[in-house]
Amino acid sequence: MDALALWQHYQDWLYYHPELEFYVDVSRMGLTPEVVHRLEPAFERAFEQMKELEAGAIANPDEGRMVGHYWLRDPDLAPSPELRSQIRDAIAQVKQFSQQVHSGAIAPPQGGHFTEILSIGIGGSALGPQFVAAALAPVHPPLNIHFLDNTDPAGFERVFAELGDRLRTTLVLVISKSGGTPETRNGMLEAQARFQRAGLAFADHAVAVTLPGSGLAQVAESNGWLAIFPMFDWVGGRTSELSTVGLLPAALQGIDIDDLLMGAKLMDQATRVPNIRQNPAALLALAWHHAGKGRGEKDMVILPYKDSLLLFSRYLQQLVMESLGKETDLNGNIVHQGIAVYGNKGTTDQHAYVQQLRDGLPNFFVTFIEVLRDGQEPSIEVEPGITAGDYLSGLLLGTRQALYEKNRPSLTVTIPEVTPKTVGALIALYERAVGLYGFLVNINAYHQPGVEAGKKAAAANLALQRQIVKVLEQSDEPLDLGAIAGAINAPDQLERIYLILRHLAANDRGIEQLGDPAQPSQLQFRWQR
């Protein structure tokens, strides 16, 4: 296609939202009217299924749940007065609590104001708040945010070292539907221990974000925590950023949550249009489906050309991969669906893996995220008539063209600037695109059985560890792996037993390892008395 034909093709496929000043360009994805025509029946079904989902249908059949994250930014859509009231009350509670913290009405018992947030959560309870904080938090926020989003002792040490004496002015958010998620529970227990060591009452600093009546809610209530905010069982973790999970930390940092919600609401309205060419989320789902032949054959590379959007690819990794990565479809057929997502930021990536994107395996499509406004301050000229922002834009356009010349597909999402409204719109755009794609390929995009399988396997390993330690505690002599395996009736688990013992020995957990580490089968282990 020559340059003039490509220009016309760009105009033919361009989507623009006037109120959000939001563009979606899929002209470099190889789409044709024939592709649209072929998938129109599937999209008609997907639009109808999405309409039913928003009306309160059981859209997550495996867990028997409604899927209601769209109601969070437009409570009038919720299917019952009770739900509408719960959503509005939760938002009002977030605003009131944040205002009281900012004013000092809610303050540390030692005096002064809260200055730090320690957010404890994992998965959607961390990735969304981290993305929004990186994108939108002011340079000098009313409270600085820190995250415990793993069960890594070295990570705990680093965060608590950063807090230092400011632990006494730290507000702790514990975010978990039940409170039983091991990583979140461990982070909470580590935090409690740090507060106790510092002579501080944890309850005077603690807030729970959880399901009403959950184990965590009961702990918070019985111990007199500062507040309890509701989560809803009809909102999944990866779509929870615009619930209390994300709104509370955002509001505490001084981010305008009304604009976040408004941006999402406006995008939701745009993505309800039952016409592929006039619906930006449908255009994304169409492009993904065409690129990967409906089987996820191409990876999704996310390249935001703005430092503040660095974490968008990590956020989308969970949203896309946890939603679409499924073994079976809704009819029980083995399909192994999914789209792999990775990315960093432009132009860093042009000095990293874009070399492979242009000249290596053509197993991907690129999504450029373009931000029109360079910054808030006037830019100097780094060359006559050229600013640093001109270079950023030029490198985006140059990479897009270089990929096109090698028949590497790409699409571009353009926003005017990074604001709460545009970030809310981005979140809503991809939530809807993922939902539509899930309907196109007939999978449940709202459960995560693979994650649950991993949790069960981890629990089994910890149970095995307890058995191993008990055997060694009771033995007067060193034991080899075979003897340990026989004693716990697990003769086929030599590798797991070895790996568990190696970890315990490395951490001075009472296990002594004897022998040559290069010969694991010859090692012996004993309990250090």
Curated annotation (Swiss-Prot):
<feature type="active site" description="Proton donor">
    <location>
        <position position="322"/>
    </location>
</feature>
<dbReference type="GO" id="GO:0005829">
    <property type="term" value="C:cytosol"/>
</dbReference>
<dbReference type="InterPro" id="IPR035476">
    <property type="entry name" value="SIS_PGI_1"/>
</dbReference>
<comment type="similarity">
    <text>Belongs to the GPI family.</text>
</comment>
<dbReference type="GO" id="GO:0048029">
    <property type="term" value="F:monosaccharide binding"/>
</dbReference>
<dbReference type="GO" id="GO:0097367">
    <property type="term" value="F:carbohydrate derivative binding"/>
</dbReference>
<keyword id="KW-0963">Cytoplasm</keyword>
<keyword id="KW-0413">Isomerase</keyword>
<feature type="active site">
    <location>
        <position position="455"/>
    </location>
</feature>
<dbReference type="GO" id="GO:0051156">
    <property type="term" value="P:glucose 6-phosphate metabolic process"/>
</dbReference>
<dbReference type="InterPro" id="IPR035482">
    <property type="entry name" value="SIS_PGI_2"/>
</dbReference>
<dbReference type="GO" id="GO:0006094">
    <property type="term" value="P:gluconeogenesis"/>
</dbReference>
<comment type="pathway">
    <text>Carbohydrate degradation; glycolysis; D-glyceraldehyde 3-phosphate and glycerone phosphate from D-glucose: step 2/4.</text>
</comment>
<dbReference type="InterPro" id="IPR018189">
    <property type="entry name" value="Phosphoglucose_isomerase_CS"/>
</dbReference>
<dbReference type="InterPro" id="IPR001672">
    <property type="entry name" value="G6P_Isomerase"/>
</dbReference>
<dbReference type="InterPro" id="IPR046348">
    <property type="entry name" value="SIS_dom_sf"/>
</dbReference>
<comment type="pathway">
    <text>Carbohydrate biosynthesis; gluconeogenesis.</text>
</comment>
<dbReference type="GO" id="GO:0004347">
    <property type="term" value="F:glucose-6-phosphate isomerase activity"/>
</dbReference>
<dbReference type="Pfam" id="PF00342">
    <property type="entry name" value="PGI"/>
</dbReference>
<protein>
    <recommendedName>
        <fullName>Glucose-6-phosphate isomerase</fullName>
        <ecNumber>5.3.1.9</ecNumber>
    </recommendedName>
</protein>
<dbReference type="GO" id="GO:0006096">
    <property type="term" value="P:glycolytic process"/>
</dbReference>
<comment type="function">
    <text>Catalyzes the reversible isomerization of glucose-6-phosphate to fructose-6-phosphate.</text>
</comment>
<keyword id="KW-0312">Gluconeogenesis</keyword>
<keyword id="KW-0324">Glycolysis</keyword>
<feature type="active site">
    <location>
        <position position="351"/>
    </location>
</feature>
